[in-house]
């Protein structure tokens, strides 16, 4: 659910500023969302955004919180009649009715394992400000966030069992001069951001070169507090192929460049979290 034109200031002043049960009038946004895929995945979040924080200048401020849990598949699934029939059909050439085991179907949901899971929750606060220099198209934002990971027999990270904490600050300098946020016909966009955690390994007095990557106890201790510095650069340029004044829906040629770098403070303590994926945006 998304409530636009929300007003936190009018929350305790019912009357003409209310529309139904919600206060209106300040252009703020309140968003509450939930997503679930039965027993395997659940996600809940709430956020508040004020584009005119303070009421006098277009300074943005937001608060948000989220919680999610994802479970894994039991090893019994891969030994089920469904999987066995699939592999048997591949190697024996049986492509008929029995290949899909319709008569004895073992559905995926019967094999979820609640003991194998990753739980995450976090909170964040963001402040953004328009800049006058170098020009009026620049904006600076700063976000302080905290996430906690709770892993139970989760085989997709070096830390399979444990609790990891991620406290970071994200600083972003951006510029946008596009003429339309939905269908840009001209102008450009760019952003340069850095996300930093405290360099714990530089002052905790621990020699991480002696930690073993095959020991779960060592991995839990090493990544109890995650550390990294993450840099990202994104740029888009929109070039109209026809005169945008004369042709409202002119074809547009877009050029795009993106760059990302995940760094570490200690070569023996590299973060398994916040990494980049091939084909993803990090």
Q: Regions from the language model: what does each represent?
A:
Residues 1-183:
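Gram-negative/organellar outer-membrane beta-barrel architecture
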Residues 2, 152-282:
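C-terminal outer-membrane beta-barrel translocator/porin domains of Gram-negative envelope proteins
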């Amino acid at each position: 659910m998304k409530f636009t034109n929300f007003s936190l200031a009018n929350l305790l002043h019912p009357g003409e500023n209310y529309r139904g049960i919600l206060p209106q009038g300040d252009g703020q946004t309140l968003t509450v969302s939930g997503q679930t895929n039965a027993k395997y995945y659940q996600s809940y979040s709430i956020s508040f955004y004020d584009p005119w924080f303070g009421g006098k200048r277009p300074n943005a401020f937001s608060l948000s919180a989220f919680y999610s849990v994802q479970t894994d598949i039991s090893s019994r699934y891969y030994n089920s009649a469904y999987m066995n029939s699939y592999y048997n059909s591949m190697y024996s050439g049986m492509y008929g009715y029995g290949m899909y085991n319709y008569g004895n179907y073992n559905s995926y949901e019967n094999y979820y394992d609640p003991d194998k899971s990753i739980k995450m929750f976090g909170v964040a606060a963001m402040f953004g400000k328009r800049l006058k220099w170098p020009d009026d198209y620049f904006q600076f934002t700063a976000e302080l966030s905290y996430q906690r990971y709770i892993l139970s027999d989760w085989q997709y990270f070096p830390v399979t069992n444990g609790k990891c904490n991620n406290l970071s600050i994200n600083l972003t300098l951006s510029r946008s001069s596009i003429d339309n946020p939905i269908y840009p016909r001209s102008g450009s966009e760019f952003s340069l951001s850095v996300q930093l955690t405290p360099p714990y390994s530089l002052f905790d007095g621990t020699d991480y070169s002696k930690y073993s990557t095959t020991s779960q106890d060592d991995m839990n201790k090493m990544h109890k507090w995650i550390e990294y510095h993450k840099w990202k650069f994104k740029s888009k340029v929109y070039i109209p192929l026809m005169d945008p004044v004369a042709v409202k829906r002119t074809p547009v040629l877009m050029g795009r460049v993106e760059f990302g770098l995940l760094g570490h403070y200690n070569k023996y303590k590299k973060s398994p979290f916040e990494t980049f994926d091939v084909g993803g945006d990090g």
